[in-house]
Regions:
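M14 metallocarboxypeptidase catalytic domain recognition
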Residues: 1-380
Length: 380
């Protein structure tokens, strides 16, 4: 295979990190040599803002239709917290392996009464940049539409939203500075030179069984023990502390265009299947209404693949009745390099889905038999 001919790249592959080289080769082999991204280096530089000056801006000037570095995201979080004191509270739940703070935004009208809560995390896997872009988009839309959108106002008045824009902060920075396709955390291993753990295989639920690897050099490495990663441990501790309030857990990933719910680790039906299936159906229907983009939905094990130690399964096993994982756009054409031009439509449609899931928490679930009308919704 002649990489120079089949990929038409304007850079030497030898200058790229090994994981990127392998990704390109496999990507090309899997598609018979078709060129989907003719200039990979240019696309990466465009998304990272390489060669351009990106100055800190006020919230009103913040561009939600480009990808942002961790520094920019955290500066934005501080600004959001400063300018919306009546609806936003910002706090840290711990520190990453490399010592960076793990910031969370709490959205919702301040009240003394008990409120249910929704947890949303993005950026568990470093290379999935559309995740942090969505978390920022959600915050922006929730705050800006609070005054005129009756649905959003009701959600903010009756629920709290815990938003973690970048879960895997160390890995996210590494994906900006060194390896665009980096997935894992950045923790060191005592026996191997390979670094990092898959933060979505490190949870204490069927840990390191099917769909996870015990080898530190693999992308799905489960870690030396459950919650070995300080990022995972911090989120797990927070959710345990607030499990009586948190009724929905939503983790944003990419890519595949799917909405998944438990179980990931086995082929079995969850006890509240009817309620969760109905919520998923309503969510993808709302998503489809924006631009006609089709999402598959169902149990992760049968819809995507079997995996163990996932945050979604852990959340469900720890008493959060509605646990979901989104796999956002696309289905492989751009993959992890989703163009910035698609941030707006991707986030707009996903916003509809998350609002629908959240609205469902304010209603009593009808536990009768739920059946999908495939003739009415053939795209699902």
């Amino acid at each position: 295979l002649s990489l120079s001919l089949s990929l038409s790249l304007s850079l030497s592959l030898s200058l790229l990190p090994l994981t990127v080289q392998i990704y390109i080769i496999l990507y090309c082999l899997g598609r018979g040599g078709w060129v989907f991204i003719s200039n990979l280096q240019k696309e990466i530089e465009k998304q990272t803002g390489y060669g351009s000056s990106r100055k800190r801006r006020s919230e009103s000037q913040y561009d939600y239709e480009v990808y942002h570095s961790l520094e920019e995201i955290q500066s934005w979080m501080f600004e959001i917290n400063r300018t919306h004191p009546h609806l936003v509270d910002m706090f840290s739940i711990g520190r990453s392996y490399e010592g960076r703070p793990l910031y969370v935004l709490q959205l919702g009208k301040r009240t003394r009464s008990y409120k249910k809560a929704v947890w949303i995390d993005c950026g568990v896997h470093a290379r999935e940049w559309i995740g942090p872009a969505f978390c920022q988009w959600f915050v922006k839309e929730a705050l800006h539409s609070y005054q005129y959108d009756s649905v959003m106002r009701r959600l903010m008045n009756q629920l709290n939203f815990y938003i973690m824009p970048v879960f895997n902060v160390d890995g996210y920075i590494f994906s900006w500075t060194t390896d665009r396709f980096w997935r894992k955390t950045r923790s060191k291993n005592r026996k191997y030179h390979c670094r990092g753990v898959d933060a979505n295989r490190n949870w204490k639920v069927k840990w390191c069984e099917e769909g996870a690897s015990s080898h530190p050099c693999d992308d799905t490495y489960c870690g030396p023990f459950p919650e070995s990663e300080p990022e995972v441990k911090a989120v797990a501790k927070f959710l345990r502390k607030h499990k009586k309030r948190v009724k929905a857990y939503v983790s944003i990933h990419a890519y595949a265009q799917m909405l998944l719910y438990p179980y990931s680790y086995k082929y079995a039906t969850i006890p509240n299947f009817n309620c969760v299936e109905s919520a998923a159906h309503n969510a993808v229907t709302a998503l489809y209404s924006a631009y006609g983009v089709r999402y598959r939905y169902g149990p992760a094990s049968t819809t995507l693949y079997v995996s163990s130690g996932s945050s979604m399964d852990w959340a469900y096993r720890n008493g959060i009745p509605y646990a979901f994982a989104f796999e956002l756009r696309d289905t492989g054409y751009f993959g992890f390099l989703l163009p910035e031009a698609l941030i707006n439509p991707t986030c707009t449609e996903t916003m509809r889905a998350v609002k629908t899931i959240s609205s469902g928490l304010l209603k009593k679930c009808e536990t009768g038999t739920y059946q999908l009308d495939r003739e009415r919704y053939p795209y699902l």
